[in-house]
Amino acid sequence: MTPLTLALDVMGGDFGPAVTVPAALQALNSDPHLHLLLVGDPDAITPLLARADFEQRSRLQIIAAESVIASDVRPSQAVRNSRGSSMRIALELVKEGRAQACISAGNTGALMGLAKLLLKPVDGIERPALVTVLPHQQKGKTVVLDLGANVDCDSTMLAQFAIMGSVMAEEALGIENPRVALLNIGEEETKGLDSIRDAAALLKTVPSLNYIGYLEANELLTGKTDVLVCDGFVGNVTLKTMEGVVRMFLSLLKSQGEGKKRSWWWLLLKRWLQKSLSRRFSHLNPDQYNGACLLGLRGTVIKSHGAANQRAFAVAIEQAVQAVQRQVPQRIAARLESVLPKSD
């Protein structure tokens, strides 16, 4: 297999190198063909590589960065002052062809702005969208976008997201003629914001799209659609609410009845139920699907949760590997040519 090189913004996220560097070593252990460029402060990175063996170090390179983009800085300010930052350098490595993808847990708005500036959107796309693939109760997967890259979206942007999501479901997940729905407050055609209703009218005119109408948030994990489209504000709130509920549920499975004296048979039954339910619902654990792809760019960019732990950030690295191997940006660009007008 051909070696694959990824650029990691090691300094991004709530925990910085303390999480991203161990996750990088974990990813190297899992993939012998993977090479990583660790972009950040060498003084912060080097001590965390003490446990890396010679073989791992041979597939690692530290790229020095002078600064870190703060999580609370405005995107426009972040882009203006981004030179020398770990996020910008990681994206520049992709632009220069030294890396095939970039992964960052940093400021979402800054990542969006810099990626659009440096890597450029594909023809016909106004703005990229953050997309992830969520598991549902049918043991299948649903493509969901936008998850926060664009807080305010008009109908044209929502229609473009729908087309990109449909292409990703078909090309990356192998779903033939994927069903596409708009997230709304009801299934009736008269409900929702003007932008959603106008987007619905647009999607009905796209012959290559299997548009099925509106879907409500309580049906997100039911498997009723293969692609779910919304603006970034709604998508981000929906995703984080779902993740919070799932984490609480999984936590309750582990802690139920702790601290109380129980008979041996009750404890045995409890342990069996916990294991059974944990296996049944483990595929919903947010750590297992961390990493949202910034879809619609000419290169591959993966946004990790800022609060991701080591396991979750390693999953984001794996998401980048899969996106590159499947040539997601190239396939999307090729498919969009037939359904979207060229930008001037």
Swiss-Prot record:
Predominant subcellular localization, coarse grouping: cytoplasm
Pathway: Lipid metabolism; phospholipid metabolism
S-S bridge residues: none
Keyword annotations from UniProtKB, A to Z: Cytoplasm, Lipid biosynthesis, Lipid metabolism, Phospholipid biosynthesis, Phospholipid metabolism, Transferase
Subcellular location: Cytoplasm
Catalytic function, reaction form: a fatty acyl-[ACP] + phosphate = an acyl phosphate + holo-[ACP]
Residues passing through the membrane, by range: none
GO cellular component: cytoplasm
GO BP terms: fatty acid biosynthetic process; phospholipid biosynthetic process
EC number, as in UniProt: 2.3.1.274
Family: Belongs to the PlsX family.
Subunit structure: Homodimer. Probably interacts with PlsY.
HAMAP family: PlsX
Protein name stated in the entry: Phosphate acyltransferase
UniProt source species: Cronobacter sakazakii (strain ATCC BAA-894)
Gene: plsX
